[in-house]
């Protein structure tokens, strides 16, 4: 079987209004999280990476080790999160399957991503399957793995259209992959309180 072409898209252009600053600038223990998120996807075997950012952050992330080829500038980031996805989709080949992730879920690990990919590959038609990690209690997590046959549908989305519409329209194609003992795929950071919670979990794990 041919090696699947996995294209990770990291959505990182949000203004972070509730957080108080752009989410791409999230730090834990004084370390920028976005480069670590990108490394997790590379370690998991993603051959392609598109990191969608605001124009004013380009130099910062070039200095942090990301490449110009990996960075995608969203010229209108306040149009909605899906506007960032649409920017990245311009780089996606018809052979690419997508792993869509948000930078405000920083504790994703390469192991979790690999578990998702392995389970997705085990189904009869991965290209026609959408997969996500889920908690033992059924809570959906991240990233979202989208088989290549759904990419044309995504390209028709409006800039302010929620990504969950893809799941709503294709319920029979959804594969939930249970991930136990790992809060990383389910912990989003939208407020200072959530940031402090995640930081405390990291401190407790030391």
Model segments located where?
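Residue-level signal for inorganic ion chemistry
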Residues: 10, 22, 34, 49, ...
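Short catalytic helix/loop segments, enriched in acidic residues and glycine
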Residues: 26-38
């Amino acid at each position: 079987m041919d090696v699947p072409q996995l294209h990770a898209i990291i959505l990182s252009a949000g203004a972070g209004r509730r957080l108080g600053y752009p989410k791409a600038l999230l730090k834990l223990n004084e370390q920028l999280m976005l480069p670590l998120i990108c490394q997790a996807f590379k370690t998991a075997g993603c051959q392609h990476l598109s990191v969608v950012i605001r124009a004013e952050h380009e130099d910062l992330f070039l200095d942090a080790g990301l490449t110009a080829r990996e960075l995608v500038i969203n010229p209108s980031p306040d149009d909605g999160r899906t506007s960032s996805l649409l920017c990245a989709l311009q780089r996606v080949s018809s052979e690419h399957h997508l792993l869509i992730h948000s930078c405000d879920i920083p504790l994703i690990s390469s192991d979790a991503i690999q578990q998702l990919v392995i389970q997705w590959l085990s189904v009869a038609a991965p290209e026609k399957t959408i997969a996500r990690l889920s908690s033992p209690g059924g809570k959906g997590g991240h990233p979202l793995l989208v088989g290549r046959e759904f990419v044309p549908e995504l390209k028709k989305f409006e800039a302010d259209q929620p990504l969950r519409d893809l799941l709503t329209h294709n319920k029979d194609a959804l594969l939930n992959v249970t991930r136990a003992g790992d809060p990383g795929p389910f912990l989003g950071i939208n407020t200072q309180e959530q940031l402090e919670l995640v930081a405390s979990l990291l401190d407790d794990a030391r």
